[in-house]
Amino acid sequence: MPAAYAHYRFGAAMLSTMPGDISRSVKRYRRLYDVGLHGPDLFFFYNPLISTKAGKLGGKFHSQTGQEFFTRVCRSLRLEPSEAGQAYLYGVLCHYCLDSLCHPFVEDMSREGSVGHIQIESEFDRFLLEKDGKSPACQQDISHHMQLLPEECAVVARFYPGATPRQIQAGVKNMALVKKMLATKDGKSRDLLAKTIGIASKDYAAFVMKAEPDPACAHLDDGLFALYKNAEKAFPELLLQLGAHLTYNAPLGKDFTPTFG
């Protein structure tokens, strides 16, 4: 799956492709849409250093197919309509669209080579940040949009059976805190942070983006960016299908058969 900046960038770009009524809902509930762009990832940050029941929800919902996840959520929204919930739904759709198209490539590359999953994602975020003129990439704080009011956390909790509004609030708050810490400008602090995170898992140390690009990942960026562009092309059709399913219970097509990844 792509990392945080890729998801945020994708969702911001997809706003311009949305019909007027959907775009207006998203603008009214922009915080919910923006957090929705990270889908179930927020659970990974509930307590990133130890295994928890809430933390495991991230893996649980990522293993669901789009059919399973969106059918359940849309059923709930038909029974209890919520414009705020729909704004979050469209954000999650962006997350799903990008994850489902990019994740198989990331998995294949991490299995075939010496480069880890998280490292590939972090380097692709660097690629996008530099493409957007945000330099140095390793010092970019992308946490500004990761915030929800208590009542908005209750909206999000409806999407994830087993989660409470308080757990949602903690996940979002900690996600923002971690992203802010990862953007520290002090080199020694970055090294210490990488070592500390590495205690939990050697692979996790790759969350701390290094000052210079990793040459082992350079050949993967173009392939991932091609998939990113494919996701941009695919999104309008997914949005159309999801809208019909939400409104008329029309069936979701084969584009919703992959898992989140």
Task: State where each predicted segment sits.
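N-terminal leader/auxiliary helical segments
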Residues: M1-L89, L93, C97-G261
